[in-house]
Amino acid sequence: MEIHSVGPFIIGKTLGQGTTGKVKLGFHKDTGFKVGIKIINKELLINKPSMRRKIEREIVLMKLIDHPNAMKMYEVYETSKYLFLILEYVEGGELFDYLVEKGGLESGEALFFFQQIIIGLEYCHSRNICHRDLKPENLLLSGDKRIKIADFGMGSIVRKDMLLHTSCGSPHYASPEVVSGIDYDGQKADVWSCGVILYALLTGKLPFDDENIRRLLNKVKNGAFSMPPYIHKDAQDLLTKMLTVDPSKRISIKEIKEHPWFVSNFNQFQKATPVEEINAEPLVDYSQIDEDIFRSLMALGVGTIDEVKQQLVSNQKSATLIYYRLLEERKKFDSDVNKYGYKPKETRRNSLSDMSLKKIFSGSNNNNNNNNNNNNNNNNNNNNNNNNNNNNNNNNNININNNNNNNNNNNNNNNNNNNNNNNNNNNNNNNNSAVGKSNDSSSQQPPHIQQPHSQQIPSNSTSQESMQISPSNSANNMAIQQPIINNNNNNNNNNNNINNNINNNINNNINNNSNNVNRPTSEGLLKQALQQHHQQQQQQFNGNNNNNTMNVQPLTMSASSSSSSSSTTPSLSPNSSTTSSTSTSPQLSAIKPDHYQRRGSMTASTNPATSPTMSHRGKTSSPIEITSKVRKLKISESQSNTPNSPIIGSSPKKSWFSYFFSKNSSSNNLNAANGSAPSSPSLQSNGVGQLQTTQANYVIESKIDVNLIYVNLEKIIKKYGFELKYQQQQQQQNIKHCIVRSHHINSDGTPQFECEIEIKPSTFINPVSPSKQHHHHHHQQQQPQQQQMPPLNLNGGQNINHDQGFRVSIIHKSGSQHKFNNFTSSLEQILTI
């Protein structure tokens, strides 16, 4: 089945697409609250454990963050195939696009953005969270130009005085110590990245840039860049201190906030409270531990199972306990529906049920509530007679259904030019359509959705009195609104309609309530939902909207060609194919300036959304290997579903911590005895390439030569100061086992760190580009042993290549989870190049 909604959200147009999946616009069914819905295919996470760990960590980190300058994540839904991350919708686009359009910014505007970046980053650092991938592509702009730090996939929890090992991020923004492959301070590395961003804000260029990756890394290591003379001297001083090669001499966040240029606009900033200063009460015993929160802590790598459990019940203050309490508060917040635009104690009027959604997609009309409408009119008449001296005339009541046979003779239902006593309202029931407005409660909007200002034609006008035009429209170009699509009104809605009509008569003015007759429907919530699901029809509408004939088709919404309203009214005709956008973003120039191109990847021309992370070290990786990796990602992206293709799967279920992660991340099991490594269930990828390592904590698929695997394995082990011992090889299956352990011994005689590694041949699937289909078929003829594999049709007909390689399975025996995570991450980087 196609998935059109996730929880209370209707899925709309595609906003973007990256390596992990698409991001679509979502609307809350009841309030119209906009969100971004990140859709991740779980098959990608099964085939690439590092990607799974990245998403897992990103989810938990975003649950710990609540700041105006950081993107929020509201909740998580999932099906058997997909993860749905409900994110804050940031309508202004990337800071990168803004810089491409504007070029170098004025000092004041650059400072305005830079201050927000530093304040948001200071908050993250106060939570001991390092971003490690700061760049303009990961900084989003809200409608009022507020910075939102996004993409915490490379983020990490860093304890005091702890150094990080993994080289990650984008090379143009990475610090010298990161690209050099040495241990580094994550917070100092973030400061360097902010320095590069500040340089880009002021100049529209990057301080370190080169098409050749090796020359680029050398420039970063040397820290040599040109300082334009037009930059303010104080800003030059701050840039020099931020782009200092020696991290011990590099300026800190606290010192940045005290710098003369930073405080030159006299803004006062509140200091972020360090996580160590937050009060947290310990748990009474293990039985109080929430399993979802516990798995989240394990995903952060804060310790082993026993260590985390002990810290949660200990009276000694620890960051782990504070994180637990913060996540506990976040879990309570997740159950609060008011975050989606509800007002306390407010009746939810405009819910789109599953049945009404089906009618939206089928385009059927529904006028089944005639009796209720008749009762409404009768009640309105009684109330109006009691509260108004209108000569027993209730022409203020609006009948929008020609099937409503009201017994009250005071209502003139079939007169298109019927004036009421207040000259504000009229009745129009011709062909069950309203001209210029509608009182259908299925099109109501919540109070927080603002309506565009419109001009009301006076009652003595020669044109139809019910017509509304925007300020830019002429009298000859009338806005024709959509007919009523859904009249399934509940009793609460009817009562609200009654009260609103009473208030209209008493006050003798136009009420701005969502039920008011003068409210235009073109911006209604139902229209917004339709607009997202019928984007392809806009082209036909644009070709026909020059016609001034007011011809209302049963399921067509038209608009004046001269209207300059900020919202466009879509057509529901099923023949058009152009995407319609309801959000505005900075208009990009047709040709990007040469001095500032996307640098999110190893090659300047690569889209940062599909860019790999910097999984190389400057002295070991060649540009050819990196370029081939980028190309492989591009091939995988190009064969995915089209941006507006439907999502197929079962109905999404709400999940505070993804069941996928709790199922496949063996180290997250709260019930594991004595902190030992519990066994993981076997993983499958559509029946092909099964991972039979039922006890492995981590699995790496590698295509490089087995001898090179051994060489790289020994390099990593030597770097960490571990010892490697090979066990007897199983000749028949060509499987090799080895033990990795640290030289340091605990008091009980066990090594401080130990893991077991198994290396064996493997066959796993890989997408094949259309241009290589013939070559792949010929390759299968030369190697008949591969023809035994049955033909596959995965991912909508995508061709699959069965690559031969090696599976490296790692079992965590003892030692800290954090050290194990670092070790496996380093090993995967060097084995998957």
Curated annotation (Swiss-Prot):
A GO molecular-function annotation: ATP binding
Main EC class of this protein? transferase
Kindly provide the name given to this protein in its UniProt entry.
Answer: Probable serine/threonine-protein kinase DDB_G0277165
Q: Which organism is it from?
A: Dictyostelium discoideum (Social amoeba)
Keywords linked to the UniProt accession: ATP-binding, Kinase, Nucleotide-binding, Serine/threonine-protein kinase, Transferase
> Residue ranges under compositional bias (Polar residues)?
460-472, 600-625
Superkingdom, natural source: Eukaryota
SUPFAM superfamilies for the chain: Protein kinase-like (PK-like)
Catalytic residues of the enzyme = 133
Q: Bias category Basic and acidic residues: which stretches?
A: 338-351
The reaction(s) annotated as catalysed by this protein in its Swiss-Prot or TrEMBL entry are:
L-seryl-[protein] + ATP = O-phospho-L-seryl-[protein] + ADP + H(+); L-threonyl-[protein] + ATP = O-phospho-L-threonyl-[protein] + ADP + H(+)
**A Pfam family of this chain:** Pkinase
Bias regions of kind Low complexity — which residues?
A: 365-432, 441-459, 528-589
